[in-house]
Amino acid sequence: MKTGKIGRILAVCIGASLLTGCGGEKQNTYRQAEENLAQGSYQEALTGYETSVSGSYKTAESLRGAGIAKLRLGDYQGAVDSFTQALSQDRVKKSMRQDLLAYRATAQLKAGLPDDAMADCQTLASDYSMNADLYFLTGCVALAMDAYDEAASNFEQAYGEKADYDMALQIYEAYQSRGMEADGTRYLEAILKTEPGNAEDYCERGRIYYYMQDYENARNELTKASEKGSVEALSLLGMVCLAQNDTAAARSMYQDYLNAEESRKAEGYNGLALCDIADGDYQSALVNIASGLEAADTDEMQELLFNEIVAYEKQLDFNTAFSKAQEYMKMYPDDQEAKKELEFLQSRIAQENVEEPAPEEGQDTASAEEQTSWEG
């Protein structure tokens, strides 16, 4: 009898242990996905979140994470689908629903569905208290719908709620993307009237002057930021020097940035590659881009990969540039500049094929050197 009882107790304990182990594994998978998302490893994060969804672990949260990963990877319709699935789950908290609606509106905007995005923005406005970020999102959606007055009203609300350098720059960039820089410049001018308080403020002021193409003031503000310990200011100073065609000074700034920065080195290598391209040293540019890609997270890769296309094009290696551009467009399908680059490369390759027709059947082919020797 005692043996049987002990056996039953052992069976229960083993079963509980197995259940705990299974739950622990699911928890670890989810936590690792969260870490990957925070670190910019979006493909790994997506895999982890999808595993969590399949295992019915934190389903709404996992669908949210998968949606964010897809959004960062450029799969905008996939992101919309994930956020929609998350919203359809039982017992989604009100705060999470707000978060999901905002993310879905962002994905819909990027997927070219501004009407759907505006519907979610209107739901947010009716069901929740609006904040600066939601006003800004609604302004971006209105801008995409050519509803300029509505966009302006929402941007004003956003800036009223959060009158800082970051918001001023975001509004400017939103207008700039639509070729309406003048509408955004007034926000830059407004924030420049505030007094800087620390190195970060001076750095942001320098960035703003750079956008306004006031390079002397940009240098002054960024130099102050650097003197106060801002490493980011060194990279921005490199951008300013490049804009002034001073590649030697720019190269020095980017090298100083690489020497001072411990983690985000990709930005420095990208800067050196830009200096190389400006100087016509395309092979060196490709070497620096390769170094940058090794150090880059997903967010930093885009500019490096685009500049890799440019370097191959400048080398007149149009076939490699075209192949790289095709890969790039799969990753960043909404990049209009890259789309134009791809079309140019396609036409350039077609032009080369017309200029160099294939030999007729049965015709011998010979190199230029062989032809020269025959003629001699």
Predicted segments — roles?
Residues 18-21:
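C-terminal motif of bacterial Sec signal peptides marking the signal peptidase cleavage site
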Residues 65, 72, 99-103, 136-137, ...:
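Canonical tetratricopeptide repeat
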Residues 27-28, 61, 95-99, 133, ...:
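Start-of-helix register in tetratricopeptide repeats
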